A protein has these predicted regions:
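Pro/Thr/Ser/Gly-rich low-complexity, intrinsically disordered linker/stalk tracts
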Residues: 413-442, 478, 493-535, 571
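Short S/T/G- and acidic-enriched coil/turn segments that sit immediately N-terminal to beta-strands
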Residues: 467-472, 560-564
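Predominantly the structural core of cysteine protease catalytic domains
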Residues: 5-6, 11-20, 37-200, 204-291, ...
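Short beta-strand elements bearing conserved aromatic residues within extracellular beta-rich modules
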Residues: 201, 295-297, 446-448, 539-541, ...
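Extracellular low-complexity, O-glycosylation-prone stalks/linkers
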Residues: 442-460, 535-553
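Short, surface-exposed beta-strand/loop patches at domain edges
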Residues: 349-414, 500-504
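Beta-strand-rich modules
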Residues: 473-494, 566-578
Length: 578
C-alpha cells in the first residue's frame, strides 16, 4: 500500500496498482512503478520515438500534482508506451515525512522510459457482475468514487457513501478493487451509510498503511458513486516481442466516431523504425467504447498510393477476425507480416458485426476547467470508408480526427530480402542474348549481371524497372560463352536492397551473321566461300531458287571450314546461297 500524500494523484496510483497487480499475477515478481513518471509526462507529453506525434499534447490546467485525472485517460496515454517506468527511475517527489520535494527536474529524455507496457485495458460502467468479471480477468480494477473519512467505520474499515443522499454521482477519488466478499455483513457499515444488503469489495487505497485496515477497506456493493471501472493487462518490457510502436494518436482525449456495420477505418505508416533493416508486424492496437465489438483486420504492404490504404498487397488471404468483449484499449495479435524499410503499409479495420462501434479517435478536446488536448492531425495518416462497394477512402483530416490504430513491429537482423527471380537466357544470331525473368512482387526493379563462363567477376550490365521483365544484351562477342544472373531489389529511404541470386547455366552467344564472300561455278558444281569465325562449331549451308525459299542442304561440323562445293546444283539454274 502506497501513500499519495501530499498530492492529488490518486489516479496515477490507481493505474500503477492495476499494472503492478497484473504483473504479479503473471508471476513476474513485485514491481514498484512510478506514479510520478505517469502524472508528470501525462501533462508534459513528448514526441514519440518514431517522431510521428510532435504536436499532440495533453494540458492539465494548473498544478499536475493537484488537478486530478482518471484511469480511462491514463490507459489511452499508456497505449503510447510512455511508461510505466520504475519508482527507482523516477521517484515520488516527497521526503520521508511526505513533505513535497520538487527540486529535482525530470529529464524529458525519460519520457518513454518503461519497465512495463500497457497491453490491454478494459473500461466499463459499474455493475456487480461486470466488476467480478474484470477482477477474474485482470485481478484488480481501478474505480472512481467519493471518499470521505467520516463515512468510514473505524472498527471495521467498512466504507459506503450514504445511499440515497444524492440524486447524482459525485467523484473525488480513485481506489483499486482487489477482491470481494459476498457475505460481508451490512452491519459493518456505519448506520449513516444506509446499507441494506450484504456484500463488499475489498479495496486498496493510496493513503498509506495507517489508514483503514493496513491501507485496505471494505466498500459496499451499494455505494452510489462507484463509477468508471478500469482494469489492465500489463507486459514486462523484457517480454514484449514487438518493440516498435507506430501511432499518430499521441494525446489522450476520449473522443469517438460511429463505425457502422461494414464500415472501415485505416492507418497508413511508413516503415522507418528498422533504420535500414526489415520489420515484422505482429500486433495491432485500437481503442473502442463498445462492448462485443467485432473486427476484420487486413494489412496491406507496399502501398502505391499513400492516400489509398488498399492500394498495396493484402497480407492475408482472408482478413483476420477478432472480437473485443469489453470496451477499452485492445492489443490484437495478428499473423506476422514482413515490412520493407521505407515502404508504406496500412492497417485496415472493418466492423464485421451487426452493431455500431464507437471507435476511439484523437481530436482536439476540452474537459471542463481541468484538462484539454490538442491533436496534430496531418493528411495521409488515418482514413475511413463507408460500407458501399463503390465507396472511396476519406482522409480523417477532413473531419479533424485521427483514428486510434497502432501497429507494433519488431526489427529483423537484416533487410527484407526479395525473392530470387526465375530467369532464362536465349542466344539470337542477330548478335544479342535475351535474358527474361518472372515477376517478383514488392520490388522496385531488377539488376542483370554477366560474367565469362570460364570465370571472372560479375559485371552489372543493366538496371531494369518493374515495367520490363527482359533485357537484350547486345554487347556480346559472337560464339563467346557467358553466365548470367538476375537480382530483384527494392528502394527505401534513398537506399537499395537486393535479394539473393542464382547463377544461370553457360550459354554461348550466337555467331555473327555469316557473310558469303564468293559463289563460283566449278567443274563438279558450285563453290561457296566464306571467312571462318573464331570459336565457331560449324556452319549450315542454305540454298534457294529465284522466287523460292531457303532450304538446308548441308551441315558442316568443322568450325575452321571456309568453303563448300554444291555438287547437286543443276546446270542452267540460278541459285542463291546463305
Amino acid at each position: 500500500v502506497k501513500n499519495q500524500n501530499p498530492f492529488g494523484t490518486c489516479w496515477a496510483f490507481g493505474m500503477a496498482a492495476i499494472m503492478e497487480t497484473s504483473l504479479l499475477a503473471q508471476n513476474k515478481g513485485t514491481y514498484d512503478l512510478s506514479e510520478e513518471h505517469l502524472s508528470y509526462f501525462f501533462s508534459n507529453r513528448q514526441n514519440d520515438p518514431l517522431g510521428n506525434t510532435p504536436d499532440d499534447k495533453n494540458y492539465v490546467l494548473g498544478n499536475y500534482h493537484e488537478t486530478g485525472g482518471n484511469d480511462h485517460l491514463a490507459a489511452i496515454y499508456l497505449s503510447t508506451w510512455a511508461g510505466m517506468t520504475t519508482e527507482a527511475d523516477v521517484p515520488f517527489p516527497t521526503d520521508s515525512s511526505h513533505q513535497n520535494d520538487l527540486t529535482v527536474q525530470i529529464p524529458e529524455s525519460k519520457a518513454y522510459n518503461s519497465a512495463a507496457y500497457l497491453k490491454n485495458a478494459s473500461v466499463s460502467k459499474y455493475s456487480e457482475e461486470r466488476m467480478k468479471e474484470m477482477l477474474l480477468n485482470d485481478h484488480a480494477v481501478s474505480i472512481m468514487l467519493y471518499m470521505k473519512e467520516s463515512y468510514v467505520n473505524p472498527d471495521t474499515a467498512a466504507y459506503c457513501y450514504p445511499v440515497g443522499k444524492s440524486n447524482s454521482t459525485v467523484i473525488n477519488h480513485i481506489v483499486t478493487v482487489v477482491g470481494w466478499d459476498d457475505t460481508y455483513s451490512k452491519d459493518n457499515f456505519l448506520p449513516v451509510s444506509n446499507v441494506t444488503s450484504d456484500g463488499a469489495w475489498i479495496i486498496k487505497n493510496s493513503w498509506g498503511e495507517k489508514k483503514g485496515d493496513g491501507g485496505y477497506y471494505y466498500l459496499s456493493y451499494q455505494d452510489p458513486n462507484i463509477n468508471k471501472l478500469v482494469s489492465a493487462e500489463a507486459v514486462a518490457v523484457s517480454d514484449q516481442k514487438y518493440r516498435n510502436n507506430y501511432f499518430y494518436d499521441g494525446s489522450s482525449a476520449l473522443s469517438v466516431i460511429p463505425i457502422q456495420a461494414g464500415q472501415s477505418v485505416a492507418a497508413v505508416y511508413e516503415t522507418t523504425a528498422g533504420k535500414g533493416k526489415a520489420e515484422v508486424l505482429g500486433e495491432v492496437n485500437l481503442v473502442t467504447n463498445s462492448d462485443n465489438a467485432c473486427y476484420k483486420i487486413q494489412i496491406y504492404t507496399d502501398l502505391t498510393d499513400p492516400y489509398d490504404p488498399e492500394s498495396g498487397t493484402a497480407a492475408y488471404a482472408a482478413p483476420y477476425e477478432f472480437e473485443q468483449p469489453i470496451a477499452g484499449v485492445q492489443t490484437i495479435s495478428v499473423p506476422e507480416v514482413v515490412l520493407k524499410q521505407g515502404s508504406r503499409y496500412s492497417v485496415v479495420i472493418t466492423n464485421s458485426g451487426i452493431d455500431k462501434i464507437s471507435f476511439g479517435v484523437e481530436a482536439k478536446s476540452s474537459y471542463g476547467n481541468w484538462f484539454t488536448c490538442t491533436a496534430g492531425i496531418e493528411t495521409g495518416q488515418t482514413f475511413y470508408k463507408s460500407a458501399s462497394e463503390t465507396a472511396r477512402w476519406t482522409d480523417g483530416k477532413t473531419k479533424n480526427w485521427t483514428a486510434r490504430i497502432k501497429a507494433h513491429t519488431r526489427t529483423l537482423n537484416q533487410s527484407w530480402v526479395p525473392d530470387t527471380p526465375v530467369f532464362q537466357v536465349k542466344a539470337y544470331n542477330s548478335g544479342y542474348n535475351l535474358i527474361s525473368w518472372e515477376k517478383v512482387s514488392g520490388v522496385t526493379g531488377y539488376y542483370v549481371y554477366r560474367k565469362p563462363a570460364a570465370g571472372g567477376k560479375w559485371s552489372k550490365i543493366a538496371d531494369v524497372g518493374t515495367s520490363e521483365l527482359k533485357y537484350k544484351d547486345s554487347k556480346v562477342t559472337a560464339n563467346a560463352s557467358y553466365r548470367y544472373t538476375v537480382k530483384a531489389y527494392y528502394e527505401a529511404s534513398g537506399k537499395r536492397y537486393s535479394g539473393k541470386y542464382k547463377t544461370g547455366d553457360v550459354i554461348k552467344a550466337a555467331p555473327a551473321v555469316q557473310k558469303v564472300t564468293s559463289v563460283k561455278s566449278e567443274k563438279n558444281g558450285i563453290r561457296i566461300r566464306w571467312k571462318p569465325q573464331k570459336k565457331c562449331d560449324g556452319y549450315y549451308i542454305y540454298r534457294k531458287k529465284k522466287g523460292g525459299s531457303y532450304q538446308l542442304i548441308k551441315k558442316i561440323s568443322n568450325g575452321n571450314s571456309s568453303s563448300y562445293l554444291d555438287k547437286k546444283a543443276q546446270k542452267g539454274v540460278s541459285y542463291y546461297y546463305a
